[in-house]
């Protein structure tokens, strides 16, 4: 997607993709999958997600990446957090408050040195924000940034693409396997009907919407 598209969505407050509550799949499956460990978590295309506050409250250090400075500013302001901002060059600004740090800039311009060491990935809104022709590039960037392939909780949507043009875009299970299967063991945790909770998508003509959660773990070395 063109960056200007997302900048305009935030300027016009067309942010129906923002969830006003913590994602229930995160609440259900993160403790079960991660256990007592408290790894540093990378949240790509994080927006102003409350999920990051939930992760922080569980003892994680959180690193988010977001294109829109409006989203970054609103995240800290709406959660009563005072952030320190630092220009990093290459078009990035870091905004930091305690254990939450957001890198404001284009995901595809991120470099491993900006990310640092990460112990887990949480993707609720990144892959589904990419049209199918960009999803491979998104996954390649994950591997480039984090070659150690930390575990990932991935949440996707499935629907008939003929009924609606995204975003959000459908990511069928076979696409998850194609994109991440070479490096990860993929476990389907949940598949639930999500149409009732997304009236704005029903209004666009969707007759079916399935939200799926996957737990991805690195393939065992030969």
Curated annotation (Swiss-Prot):
InterPro entries: SAM-dependent_MTases_sf, Thiopur_S-MeTfrase_Se/Te_detox, Thiopurine_S-MeTrfase, TPMT. One of its GO terms (molecular function) is thiopurine S-methyltransferase activity. The keyword Cell membrane does not apply. It comes from the Bacteria. Its EC number is 2.1.1.67. Pfam families: TPMT (PF05724). This is Thiopurine S-methyltransferase. The gene is tpm.
């Amino acid at each position: 997607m063109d960056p200007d598209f997302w900048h305009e969505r935030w300027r016009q407050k067309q942010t129906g993709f923002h969830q006003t509550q913590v994602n229930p799949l995160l609440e259900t499956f993160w403790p079960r999958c991660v256990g007592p460990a408290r790894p540093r978590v990378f949240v790509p295309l994080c927006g102003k997600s409350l999920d990051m506050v939930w992760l922080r409250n569980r003892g994680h250090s959180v690193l988010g990446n977001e294109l829109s400075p409006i989203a970054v500013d609103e995240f800290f302001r709406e959660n009563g957090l005072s952030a320190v901002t630092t220009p990093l060059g290459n078009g990035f600004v870091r905004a930091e408050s305690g254990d939450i740090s957001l890198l404001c800039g284009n995901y595809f311009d991120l470099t491993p040195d900006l990310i640092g060491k990460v112990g887990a990935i949480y993707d609720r809104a990144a892959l589904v924000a990419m049209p199918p022709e960009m999803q491979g590039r998104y996954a390649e960037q994950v591997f480039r940034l984090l070659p150690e392939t930390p575990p990932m909780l991935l949440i996707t949507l499935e629907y008939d693409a003929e009924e609606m043009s995204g975003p959000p875009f459908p990511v069928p299970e076979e696409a998850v396997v194609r994109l991440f299967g070479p490096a990860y063991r993929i476990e389907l945790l949940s598949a639930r009907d999500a149409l009732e909770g997304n009236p704005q998508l029903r209004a666009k003509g969707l007759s079916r919407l399935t939200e799926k959660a996957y737990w991805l773990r690195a393939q065992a070395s030969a």
